[in-house]
C-alpha cells in the first residue's frame, strides 16, 4: 500500500499541480482514496498521505515503461514500429507520442513540495525550451529502412533530447531552495524551522546532483537499459502475458483514482538508476536486469540487494534448466537416430534385401474392431452435460469428458476443490468457528466484521466455470511451479474488478493449485485480491510471485463437490460479454437487486 500511495500522490500532484498544503487537503485526499478503494485507510496510510502532501517527495529516480494501452488493449509494445500499429489506433498512439517529451521530462523533474514552487519550475523549464524542430510523431512515423524506429528507441531518443534541460532545472532548484532557506520565518518554532530547513536542503542537494554529468548520463543509461530489458521480456512469450497484465493492472488502478485523465500514457516506475546500472555492469546480463524489471512491474518489488540476489538466482536456475532440457533433447535425438540405423540393419537379409513381414491371421478383423472402439470412445468423450448456473460449482469441480483433441490440456481442464476454499461458501458464523478451530494461525481470532469482508473476496466459487472453459487461457496466466510444504504448487492469475454496492475495486483473481496424490489438480486458494488494500492481509504475497502464505495443505481435504447445491434463495448468474467474464450475485429476497459483481477481464489484447 505504501508504494502505491506514494506513487499515486506524486503522480496526481504532477498532473494537476494543485496546492496540497493544509489539513483540509489531507482529509480530501483521504476521502478520495477511501472511495476508490472502498475501504478505510489505516492511521499509518493517512500519515503517508500527510507527509506526501506537506513534505517534499519525488526525489527518487524513475523510468518510463515503453507500453501504450487504450481501452483494455495494448496498442503499442516496446518493439512496435509505426507501421506495426493497427490503423484504427494510430490516431490515439500519435496523441500519446506527442505527450512523450513532457512525460519523459516529468519522470526526471517531478518534485513535490509545499507551495508547488518545484512544479512551477518544472513547467517553466519545459515551456521555455524550444522543441520547434522536433516532432516525435514525425520521427516515429517517417523513419525508414532498417533504422525504422521502435517505440523503445523513440523513448530513449526523447530522453536524450530532454537532457539539455536537466542542468537548468537543477540549478533553478538549488538556487530557489537556498533563497527559501535564507528566508525562513523567525516566527516559526525551533522545531518547525529545523524541519523546513531540512526539507529545503534535501531539495538543494537534489538540484546539485542533477547538475552533474554523471547523474545526467545515468538518466539516459538507466532508461536505455530499461528499454532493452523490456525487449528481452517481450521476446520470451512465457513472460509477455504476465508483464502486460502487471502493467495493465496499474493502468486500471490509476484510472480509478483519476478517471478524468483520458490519455493512457506510458507508466512511471520508481527504480534506483544507480542500482540498475551497477547490476547490469556487474553481471553483463540483460536477462538479470529483465528479471528485476519483472519484479518491479509484476510483483511490485523495489530494486534492492535482496531483489537483485533473487533475480540472479532465478536466472541461473532457469538457464541451468534450459541447458538440461537442451542436452536431454540432444540425447533423445541421438538415441532415435541410432535406433533408426539399427532397424535399417535388421530389416535387411543376407543379400541386402529387406525381409517381408507377414500379417497375422485375423489381424484385419481386429483392426476393424479397434477402429469401431476408437469411434465409440470419441463419441463418448465428446459428450458434455449442460448444468444450471446454481449447480455450476459442482460441475466446475467434477472431471468431465473431454474431446480426444483436448487431451493435451487434461492436466488443468478439471479440478478438485480443497475444503479451505469451500468453507468461504458457508455462513459467517460457521466460517469463524472453523477458522478459530483450524490449523492456520493467521486466521484465528478474526472478528465477524473481518470475516464478512474476507467472505466477499473469497466466496467466488463461480470462477471455476471459467477455469474449466476453453477460454481459460484468454483470461488467466499460469505462473511457474514451485515446491512448498511437500507439494508441487502453481498459480493462475487474472485481472478483475469487484463492484460492491457501486464501489469498485481493481485487483487480481488468484487461483492457487497443487498436485494431489492421484496427480490431479486441486484448488486450495481462490480469492479476489484488491490492489493496495489492507483487506488482503499484511504481508500477503504478490499474485504473480512464486510462493504463498499457506504452509501446509491437507491433501485429503479436497472434494469433487458432487451433489452441491447453493443455499435456498441464493442466486448468481454468469455473463460473458466484450472480453470479460462477469459473475453477478443478487439479493435472495429481491433478485432484481444486485449485491455485488466480479468482472474477470480478458488479458489485454495485443494489437
UniProtKB/Swiss-Prot annotation:
Compositional bias per record (Basic and acidic residues), positions renumbered to this chain: 313-347, 365-374
Coiled coil (UniProt feature): none
Biased composition (Acidic residues): 375-393, 549-558
Annotated spans, Disordered: 312-410, 531-570
Pfam family for this entry, one: DUF3654
Residue ranges, compositional bias (Basic residues): 353-364
Polar residues compositional bias, start-end: 531-543
Family note: Belongs to the UPF0329 family.
Protein name (record): UPF0329 protein ECU06_1610
Protein source organism: Encephalitozoon cuniculi (strain GB-M1)
Native organism taxonomy: Eukaryota, Fungi, Fungi incertae sedis, Microsporidia, Unikaryonidae
Amino acid at each position: 500500500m505504501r508504494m502505491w500511495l506514494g506513487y499515486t500522490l506524486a503522480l496526481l500532484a504532477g498532473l494537476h499541480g494543485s496546492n496540497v498544503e493544509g489539513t483540509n487537503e489531507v482529509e480530501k485526499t483521504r476521502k478520495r482514496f477511501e472511495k476508490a478503494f472502498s475501504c478505510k485507510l489505516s492511521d499509518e496510510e493517512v500519515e503517508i498521505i500527510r507527509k506526501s502532501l506537506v513534505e517534499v517527495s519525488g526525489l527518487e529516480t524513475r523510468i518510463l515503461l515503453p507500453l501504450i494501452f487504450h481501452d483494455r488493449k495494448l496498442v503499442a509494445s516496446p518493439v512496435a514500429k509505426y507501421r506495426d500499429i493497427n490503423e484504427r489506433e494510430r490516431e490515439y498512439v500519435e496523441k500519446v507520442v506527442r505527450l512523450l517529451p513532457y512525460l519523459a521530462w516529468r519522470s526526471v523533474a517531478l518534485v513535490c513540495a509545499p507551495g508547488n514552487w518545484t512544479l512551477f519550475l518544472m513547467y517553466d523549464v519545459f515551456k521555455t525550451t524550444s522543441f520547434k524542430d522536433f516532432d516525435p510523431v514525425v520521427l516515429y512515423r517517417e523513419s525508414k529502412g532498417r533504422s525504422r524506429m521502435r517505440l523503445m528507441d523513440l523513448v530513449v531518443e526523447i530522453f536524450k533530447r530532454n537532457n539539455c534541460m536537466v542542468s537548468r532545472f537543477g540549478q533553478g532548484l538549488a538556487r530557489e531552495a537556498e533563497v527559501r532557506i535564507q528566508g525562513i520565518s523567525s516566527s516559526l518554532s525551533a522545531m518547525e524551522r529545523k524541519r523546513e530547513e531540512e526539507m529545503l536542503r534535501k531539495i538543494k542537494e537534489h538540484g546539485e546532483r542533477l547538475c552533474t554529468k554523471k547523474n545526467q548520463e545515468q538518466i539516459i543509461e538507466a532508461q536505455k537499459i530499461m528499454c532493452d530489458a523490456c525487449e528481452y521480456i517481450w521476446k520470451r512469450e512465457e513472460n509477455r502475458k504476465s508483464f502486460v497484465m502487471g502493467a495493465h493492472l496499474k493502468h486500471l488502478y490509476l484510472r480509478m483514482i483519476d478517471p478524468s485523465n483520458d490519455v493512457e500514457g506510458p507508466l512511471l516506475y520508481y527504480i534506483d538508476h544507480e542500482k540498475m546500472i551497477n547490476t547490469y555492469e556487474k553481471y553483463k546480463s540483460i536477462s538479470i536486469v529483465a528479471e528485476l524489471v519483472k519484479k518491479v512491474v509484476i510483483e511490485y518489488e523495489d530494486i534492492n540487494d535482496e531483489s537483485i540476489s533473487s533475480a540472479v538466482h532465478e536466472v541461473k536456475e532457469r538457464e541451468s534448466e534450459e541447458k538440461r532440457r537442451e542436452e536431454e533433447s540432444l540425447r533423445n535425438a541421438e538415441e532415435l537416430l541410432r535406433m533408426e540405423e539399427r532397424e535399417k540393419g535388421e530389416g535387411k537379409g543376407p543379400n541386402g534385401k529387406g525381409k517381408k513381414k507377414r500379417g497375422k491371421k485375423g489381424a484385419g478383423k481386429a483392426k476393424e474392431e479397434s477402429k469401431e472402439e476408437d469411434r465409440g470412445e470419441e463419441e463418448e468423450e465428446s459428450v458434455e452435460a449442460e448444468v444450471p448456473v446454481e449447480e455450476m460449482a459442482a460441475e466446475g469441480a467434477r472431471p468431465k469428458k473431454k474431446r480426444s483433441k483436448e487431451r493435451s490440456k487434461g492436466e488443468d481442464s478439471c479440478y478438485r476443490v480443497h475444503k479451505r476454499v469451500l468453507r468461504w461458501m458457508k455462513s459467517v458464523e460457521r466460517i469463524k468457528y472453523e477458522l478459530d478451530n483450524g490449523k492456520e494461525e493467521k486466521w484465528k481470532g478474526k472478528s465477524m466484521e473481518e470475516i464478512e469482508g474476507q467472505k466477499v473476496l473469497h466466496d467466488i466459487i463461480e470462477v471455476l466455470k471459467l477455469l474449466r472453459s476453453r477460454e481459460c487461457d484468454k483470461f488467466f496466466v499460469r505462473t511457474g511451479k514451485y515446491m512448498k510444504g511437500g507439494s508441487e504448487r502453481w498459480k493462475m492469475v487474472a485481472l478483475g474488478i469487484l463492484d460492491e454496492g457501486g464501489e469498485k475495486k481493481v485487483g487480481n483473481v488468484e487461483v492457487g493449485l497443487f498436485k494431489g496424490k492421484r496427480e490431479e489438480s486441486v484448488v486450495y486458494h481462490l480469492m479476489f485480491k484488491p490492489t493496495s488494500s489492507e483487506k488482503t492481509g499484511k504481508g500477503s504475497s504478490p499474485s504473480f510471485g512464486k510462493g504463498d502464505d499457506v504452509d501446509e495443505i491437507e491433501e485429503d481435504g479436497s472434494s469433487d463437490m458432487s451433489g452441491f447445491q447453493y443455499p435456498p434463495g441464493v442466486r448468481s448468474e454468469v455473463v460473458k460479454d466484450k472480453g470479460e467474464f462477469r459473475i453477478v450475485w443478487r439479493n435472495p429476497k429481491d433478485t432484481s437487486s444486485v449485491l455485488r459483481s466480479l468482472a474477470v477481464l480478458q488479458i489485454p489484447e495485443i494489437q
